[in-house]
Amino acid sequence: MKKSACLLAAAAALALVATPAAAKPWITLYSAPNYGGHSIDIDHPVRDLDHHDWDFGDRAQSARVHGHWLMCAAKNFEGDCVHLNHDTPRLKDYGMNRRADSVRPE
């Protein structure tokens, strides 16, 4: 009985170690449909894609998505917004073609 309890505890500890941590969300925005043109990789909230570090406001036409992201047509996550949780070769299909000004993981 005691041996079974020790084995069970060891198995539980191993399962905790072997479980991968949740992957960090990221999104890659592309300036052309079907993942073409210039691209930027983002792994944190960006309130203003026009900011000098990004200079990508109103340019995105497609996106590769890992995790869940909110994409909004105005700065500071305002205006029309869409939820993205999969690769999107044509943001036009979501009404966001060349409109994204802010993005954040959810």
Features from the language model and the residues they span:
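Compact beta-sheet-dominated domain cores in extracellular/mature segments
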Residues: 2-106
